[in-house]
Amino acid sequence: MSGEDYEKRLQAWVGRTLGEPRRGQDPVNVPMIRHWVEAMGDTNPVYLDEEAARATGRETVVAPASMMQAWTMRGYAATVNPEPEAGGMEELTALLAEGGYTSVVATDSEFEFHRELVPGDHISVQEQVESISPEKKTALGEGRFITTLRTYRDQRGEVVATQRWRLLRFRPKKTEQTEQKPKALRPRPAINRDNAFWFEAAKQRRLVIQRCAACKTLRHPPGPCCPHCGSFDWDTVEAAGTGQVYSYIVAHHPPHPAFEMPYVVALVELTEGTRLVTNLVGIAPDKIEIGMPVVLDWLEADPELTLPVFRPAVPQEES
């Protein structure tokens, strides 16, 4: 296909309407107006207060002008499962994609309002292609500006507003390949004089538990004194590296560049009786069970950080 033929096919869309008029699912109504003004923080009383509206010469409350487009939106279900419309925007979009204009950004939206909308008005909209520009060089890439005119009518067919809508359909610029960035580091633990011994032992792949030298009570997380007898004297014992899942959560959000989402944060009850917050690896999240036996493994997060993690005592499928 020559460039001239493609240009003719594009320009043939100028002046055409994009599909049939689309009627709003619901008439203008006060509940939706209330939702809108509360979300926007718009306290103008003429939108919800009949008395205030009549005091300004209006017959009743009115809808904010900014809601015009909202009254004809097709809704969630139709957006998730749209039905193709002959001669609609989908066909024009496909033709633009054929020319490599696969990316889009909205550039302008100009409204002209003919009258205010009141509860009971039922709005429809039809869109017409006004112009398709020659190819332009932009900061985003080479593209074309598509200008359409949307005409909004009430249930009597009278024009209540028009909207001139402009999009830039463009070919994304090819970016030069850059050197791969090193993987982000895991967040650094807050190490202090009370817990430094624990992280030093972890560097040596030893999982230790703090023990009161006076009453022999094990404790975790580490602390300066025994919560049972108050002694400041302590030593450590090395954990066997076995335990069970006491509780867990699956983290999906917020994403962090150091972690592969989703990941499992588990509270593991060690055989010795103390509990440790850690990661559970080697198992799909939906296969985890409370009470599941787990064994110690080690994660070399980076050269400066080695952490204990746990995996199922009986190997599991990770998929």
UniProtKB/Swiss-Prot annotation:
It is an enzyme of class 4 (lyase). The keyword Glycosyltransferase does not apply. Keywords: Bile acid catabolism, Lipid degradation, Lipid metabolism, Lyase, Steroid metabolism. It comes from the Bacteria. GO terms for molecular function: lyase activity. GO terms for biological process: bile acid catabolic process; lipid catabolic process. InterPro entries: ChsH2_C (IPR002878), ChsH2_Znr (IPR022002), FAS1-like_DH_region (IPR039569), HotDog_dom_sf (IPR029069), NA-bd_OB-fold (IPR012340), Thioester_dehydratase-like (IPR052513). Belongs to the thioester dehydratase family. Probably involved in bile acid degradation. PANTHER family: BLR3430 PROTEIN. Heterodimer composed of ChsH1 and ChsH2. Two heterodimers combine to form a heterotetramer. The complex interacts with Ltp2 via the DUF35 C-terminal region of ChsH2. This is Probable enoyl-CoA hydratase alpha subunit.
